[in-house]
Amino acid sequence: MEPRYPFVAVDVPEPEADEIGALLFELGASGVEQRDEQTLVRGARSGQVTLVASFEDHGEAMEAIAALGEQSPPLAARLEEVVGDAWRDAWKEHFAPFALTPTITVVPPWAERAPEREGERVLLLEPGRAFGTGLHATTALVAELLDEHAAELRGREILDVGTGSGILALVALLLGAERAVAIDNDEDVIEVVLENAARNGLEGRIEASAGVVEAVTRRFPWVVANIEARVLRPLAPELARVLEPGGWLILSGILESERDDLIARYTSLPRPLEHVATRPDPASPGGDRRAGRGDAGGEGWVAILFRAPGGAASSPG
């Protein structure tokens, strides 16, 4: 008889997916997949995603369901079973090559290919258990801003706070950054970052470690942080501290309704940053929806570009 593998599925608001995904790992999940309407998962309403977590045995899965039901507000999770081993690679069907920016195409390792057009850069990426495939708007908006400012980025160093799969640090390196420092408070994702760097021949130009921005002791000309607005707000003094004079900061993981508060916070610091630009998600209402992008219940995402006062952070040479 073929084995039966237990999974826990729970529908959650998209802005809360990262937090609840982390909770599932704390409850013993060995992997968590995030699906939205574009992956044709039944049960997920508009503005929601379905988290599907794998567990080693049915007992752990049932304990996780009970724990989710005790959250405030309660989360209604359900047990799903998959017979046989085909599930192990089934998620790969939903991760095909796609254009992340006008010049960078994300390609999974099982679909490896060479660049197909002039100026195209291929980024080989497997997220593993880390956040960051590039399909989510919060990641793509940062990548697009980096691409647009490639001239200022070229030859510089970048700090990626909350790196996940390492996708933004690797994008920066492909665009010409000299070196990337990637940190995350989840030590389990660091191996994923280094593996993705090696896939792209970039392992000699990236330093990845578990840590928090408060422990960073030097400044950078570029800093990116794709986290959540509720985390980015209290981090404002620290993110400004690690910016060189004239340095650039990109924040993402921000809903449109949170934009003004974040801008006010970062432009009113003792060493205030200049608000340079806000980039909206083209999948938000009134924008052009692109494959692989999702909205948050009708509310779009934004990324915000700031610059520190002081000397120029222009491209050398």
Curated annotation (Swiss-Prot):
It is an enzyme of class 2 (transferase). GO terms for molecular function: protein-lysine N-methyltransferase activity. It is found in: Cytoplasm. Keywords: Cytoplasm, Methyltransferase, S-adenosyl-L-methionine, Transferase. GO terms for biological process: methylation. Its EC number is 2.1.1.-. It comes from the Bacteria. S-adenosyl-L-methionine binds at residues 139, 162, 184, 226. It catalyses: L-lysyl-[protein] + 3 S-adenosyl-L-methionine = N(6),N(6),N(6)-trimethyl-L-lysyl-[protein] + 3 S-adenosyl-L-homocysteine + 3 H(+). GO terms for cellular component: cytoplasm. InterPro entries: Ribosomal_L11_MeTrfase_PrmA (IPR050078), Ribosomal_PrmA_MeTrfase (IPR004498), SAM-dependent_MTases_sf (IPR029063). Its main location: cytoplasm. Residues 274-297 are annotated as: Disordered. Methylates ribosomal protein L11. Belongs to the methyltransferase superfamily. PrmA family. This is Ribosomal protein L11 methyltransferase. It comes from Sorangium cellulosum (strain So ce56).
